[in-house]
């Protein structure tokens, strides 16, 4: 059966049909209006473009990243996705979202097909309505709504519901697709349509013609007349899957139409290694057919004919036929709004079926290895952790040539693709490696008093003593851009603090990161904790990593302000330590020393302009304008080829001035600086609080009282007097190295070294103590005596 909705006459037809559909199928409070289905260009975050799609159907895709090349896609909507929780009526919000995503992909030039359930649920609601209308007023009042539901549902035969619901279901799909100027066509099939050669050819030809005409076929089993399912059999020497449910229908259709991708939406996140909900159930990211023995299936979903086992069998059959398959959740409110488009973009959603066995451990497995290795690190003696770090420092100098050779490859590949500041961060040198080695040895020396240090001791009562001790945070995820020197720094801090570590570097530093990680694991191997630090594959998307809240305890981003903001937005369940911007200020007071100012400005701005602690805004007291000191500052900046941007007040003082700055809240990261004029130290502080990023701010003055006022009132992580902003650094602070700079208000702030990667736990030692002993009539009293903290001997 083929029902084609033509473009001509759609609007009058929809106006006649939609009120009928709503009145029969949808309660008044839940009715969908055409205006409520927003246009794709204003609602979706998927680019509205035509993507280059030239894939010829053959082998299925090997990796998720290749799914963006899929041209022909089948989306199967399970009963649990389409229907409401009461199994009587449709989930209109989810359907509208699915239709929009399918429309987005269709308008990108892809060929979309839907295999949908929902006719039975739609018909069940309509027939309930008919039963209600056929009752007398006395019967209706007597039965009540709840009694009607109990009475009507058992006697409604599924085939009758399907017959009553098909037309309404298609009318609803038509109304939704019309909002995106897309036509849809309904095709009802049975198993016989695939077994009869002539019918197969007719079906195939019809579908191809619809796709050629840019029409979305909506396919469903003809449940009103469907015969009992037949066993899988051979058809002309080819193993075929019998159409038992919409899972098998979708698989059969995908292979028959040589589809690139089959997306199966259900009410679970994907395929688990054991029934979802069980304590040890883990979502399988990539399923390889050879791993079937590792999966235990549970019961089927609350509605529909198939369960997860049926979906997997259908998926494997489609995969064998050359179609890639993803099983995902189409009901979860946090992900269902973009689940289809996210899958096509290659994001880590659901379970991806691949004929290529995953190489190496998954990121989840790497996280577990890092946690286990971190716990082993924490149990090592302080001297052993220090020995690992010192060995890594030696390797950095001993293997200098290999490291620089790998870094040279990265620089050559990045030439012309990366901006100058990023290339500077990417570059390694002999001096950088020597500085790294020195910093690592400082960390090794300080690590001996990190893990297990007693911070507080309290005698709660007689023979009941409490201790607060330092412990590792757990598993850290450090994401860094273009800075391979970050890897050994962070690794050393993780080793010293006993934390497991996942490292995610940018692909621009892949060669450098690989060799540095190998050297790190070589150092860890001397005490058998090689797995504590893992380098995450560059294929892993940062957004996907930020969802691993059961594995990762803290995320530390090292990179651009945009990277930090993106991670803070994505990591809703995991704390993020870092700063999104490094807008550092220097205020030159009216009593500043002429000899000091130019040195401080030059060092803060020109020594390393790409650093997050480089000067970005120079605030100058009004009294210094048109003075020799001001002229010296301007001349020095010109000699250093620093581009000057004028703030609004500064521009007003000049007849001919640099272009006025577009924003006073700008991190340039290059040889550019904003100059603004202020009337007082208080105005400078107010400016910093309004436009700064709470990173590092400096005052240059010879007036101690003014300086102390500035130091006490500026609310930034680092506040300096007569010192360069570039001192805001873990190595220069004597921390050995830093894992990053934090501008947050809790836990660590400023340059974060070893102490920032530790938390605490409480140890209580008693002798059969119970709370009732301390009641009004109990035998014990609280003492709460402070006890001396033992000093550990590290000599």
Swiss-Prot record:
Reactions catalysed, semicolon-separated, are: L-glutamate + ATP = L-glutamyl 5-phosphate + ADP; L-glutamate 5-semialdehyde + phosphate + NADP(+) = L-glutamyl 5-phosphate + NADPH + H(+)
Q: Name one Pfam family in it.
A: AA_kinase
What keywords were assigned to this record? Amino-acid biosynthesis, ATP-binding, Kinase, Mitochondrion, Multifunctional enzyme, NADP, Nucleotide-binding, Oxidoreductase, Proline biosynthesis, Transferase
Where does the UniProt annotation locate this protein? Mitochondrion matrix
Region Glutamate 5-kinase, as annotated, extends over: 1-361
Q: Where does ATP bind?
A: 266-267, 305-311
Q: Give the protein's biological function.
A: Bifunctional enzyme that converts glutamate to glutamate 5-semialdehyde, an intermediate in the biosynthesis of proline, ornithine and arginine.
Annotated residues for binding of substrate: 117, 223, 246
Regulation affecting activity: Isoform Short: Inhibited by L-ornithine with a Ki of approximately 0.25 mm. Isoform Long: Insensitive to ornithine inhibition. Thus, the two amino acid insert in the long isoform abolishes feedback inhibition of P5CS activity by L-ornithine.
Q: What is its EC number?
A: 2.7.2.11, 1.2.1.41
The record lists the organism as Mus musculus (Mouse)
Q: Which GO terms describe its biological process?
A: amino acid biosynthetic process; citrulline biosynthetic process; glutamate metabolic process; L-proline biosynthetic process; ornithine biosynthetic process; proline biosynthetic process; response to temperature stimulus
Fetch the InterPro entries from UniProt. AceGlu_kinase-like_sf (IPR036393), Ald_DH/histidinol_DH (IPR016161), Ald_DH_C (IPR016163), Ald_DH_N (IPR016162), Aldehyde_DH_dom (IPR015590), Asp/Glu/Uridylate_kinase (IPR001048), G-glutamylP_reductase_CS (IPR020593), G5K_ProBA (IPR041744)
Q: Name one GO molecular function term.
A: ATP binding
| Name assigned to this protein | Delta-1-pyrroline-5-carboxylate synthase
Sites where N6-succinyllysine occurs are at: 311, 347, 550
Pathway-wise, it operates in:
Amino-acid biosynthesis; L-proline biosynthesis; L-glutamate 5-semialdehyde from L-glutamate: step 1/2; Amino-acid biosynthesis; L-proline biosynthesis; L-glutamate 5-semialdehyde from L-glutamate: step 2/2
Q: Which family does it belong to?
A: In the N-terminal section; belongs to the glutamate 5-kinase family.
Q: Which residues cross the membrane?
A: none
Q: Which GO terms describe its cellular component?
A: mitochondrial inner membrane; mitochondrial matrix; mitochondrion
> What is the name of the gene encoding this protein?
Aldh18a1
């Amino acid at each position: 059966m083929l029902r084609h909705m033509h473009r001509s006459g759609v609007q009058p037809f929809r106006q006649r049909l939609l009120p009928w559909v709503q009145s029969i199928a949808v309660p008044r409070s839940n009715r969908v209006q055409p205006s409520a289905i927003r246009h794709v260009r204003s609602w979706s975050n998927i680019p509205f473009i035509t993507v280059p799609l030239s894939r010829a159907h053959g082998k299925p895709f090997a990796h998720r990243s290749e799914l963006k090349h899929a041209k022909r896609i089948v989306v199967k909507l399970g009963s649990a996705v389409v229907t409401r929780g009461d199994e009587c009526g449709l989930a209109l919000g989810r359907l509208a979202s699915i239709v929009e995503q399918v429309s987005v992909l269709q308008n990108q030039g892809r060929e979309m097909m839907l295999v949908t359930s929902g006719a039975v649920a739609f018909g069940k609601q309509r027939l309930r309505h008919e039963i209600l209308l056929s009752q007398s007023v006395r019967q209706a009042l007597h039965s009540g709504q709840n009694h009607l539901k109990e009475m009507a549902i058992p006697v409604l035969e599924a085939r009758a519901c399907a017959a009553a619901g098909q037309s309404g279901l298609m009318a609803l799909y038509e109304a939704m697709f019309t909002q995106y100027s897309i036509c849809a066509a309904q095709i009802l099939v049975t198993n016989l349509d695939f077994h009869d050669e002539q019918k197969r050819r007719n079906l195939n030809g019809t579908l191809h013609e619809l796709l050629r005409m840019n029409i979305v076929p909506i396919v469903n089993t003809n449940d009103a007349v469907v015969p009992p399912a037949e066993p899988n059999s051979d058809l002309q020497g080819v193993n075929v899957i019998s159409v038992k449910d919409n899972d098998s229908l979708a698989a059969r259709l995908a292979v028959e139409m040589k589809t690139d991708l089959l997306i199966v939406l259900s009410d679970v996140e994907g395929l688990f290694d054991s029934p979802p909900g069980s304590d040890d159930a883990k979502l399988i990211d990539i399923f390889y057919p050879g791993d079937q023995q590792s999966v235990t299936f549970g019961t089927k979903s609350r509605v529909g004919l198939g369960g997860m086992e049926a979906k997997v069998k259908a998926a494997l059959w489609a995969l064998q036929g050359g179609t890639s398959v993803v099983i995902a959740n189409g009901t979860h409110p946090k992900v269902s709004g973009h689940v289809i488009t996210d899958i096509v973009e290659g994001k880590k959603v659901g379970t991806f079926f691949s004929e290529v066995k995953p190489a190496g451990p998954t990121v989840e497995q790497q996280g577990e290895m890092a946690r286990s290795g971190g716990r082993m690190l924490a149990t090592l003696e302080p001297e052993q952790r220090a020995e690992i770090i010192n060995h890594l420092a030696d390797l950095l100098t001993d293997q200098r040539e290999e490291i620089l050779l790998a870094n040279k490859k990265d620089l050559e590949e990045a030439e012309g693709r990366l901006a100058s500041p990023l290339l500077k961060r990417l570059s390694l040198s002999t001096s950088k490696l020597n500085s790294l080695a020195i910093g690592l040895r400082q960390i090794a020396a300080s690590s001996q008093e990190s893990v297990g240090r007693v911070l507080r001791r309290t005698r709660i009562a007689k023979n009941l003593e409490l201790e607060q001790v330092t412990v590792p945070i757990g598993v850290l995820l450090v994401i860094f851009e273009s800075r391979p020197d970050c890897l050994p720094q962070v690794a050393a801090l993780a080793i010293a603090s006993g934390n497991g570590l996942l490292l995610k570097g940018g692909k621009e530093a892949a060669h450098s990161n690989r060799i540095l990680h190998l050297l790190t694991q070589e150092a860890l191997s001397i005490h058998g904790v090689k797995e504590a630090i893992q380098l995450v594959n560059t294929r892993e998307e940062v957004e996907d990593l930020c969802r691993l809240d059961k594995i990762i305890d803290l995320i530390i981003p090292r990179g651009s302000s945009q990277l930090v903001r993106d991670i803070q937005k994505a990591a809703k369940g995991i704390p993020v330590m870092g700063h999104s911007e490094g807008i550092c200020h220097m205020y030159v007071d009216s009593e500043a020393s002429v000899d000091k100012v130019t040195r401080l400005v030059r060092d803060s701005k020109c020594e390393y302009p790409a650093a997050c602690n480089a000067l970005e805004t120079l605030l100058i007291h009004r009294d210094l304008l048109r003075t020799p000191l001001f002229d010296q500052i301007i001349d020095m900046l010109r000699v250093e080829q620093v581009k000057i941007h004028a703030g609004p007040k500064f521009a007003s003082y000049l007849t001919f001035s640099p272009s006025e700055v577009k924003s006073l809240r700008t991190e340039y990261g290059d040889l550019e600086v904003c100059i603004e004029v202020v009337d007082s130290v208080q105005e400078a502080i107010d400016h910093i609080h309004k436009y700064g990023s709470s990173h590092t701010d400096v005052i240059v003055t010879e007036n101690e009282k003014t300086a102390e006022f500035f130091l006490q009132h500026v609310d930034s992580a680092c506040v300096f007097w007569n010192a360069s902003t570039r001192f805001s650094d873990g190595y220069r602070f004597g921390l050995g190295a830093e894992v990053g700079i934090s501008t947050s208000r809790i836990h660590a702030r400023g340059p974060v070294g070893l102490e920032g990667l530790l938390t605490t736990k409480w140890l209580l030692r008693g002798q059969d103590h119970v709370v009732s002993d301390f009641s009004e009539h109990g035998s014990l009293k609280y003492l709460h005596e402070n006890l001396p903290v033992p000093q550990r001997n590290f000599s």
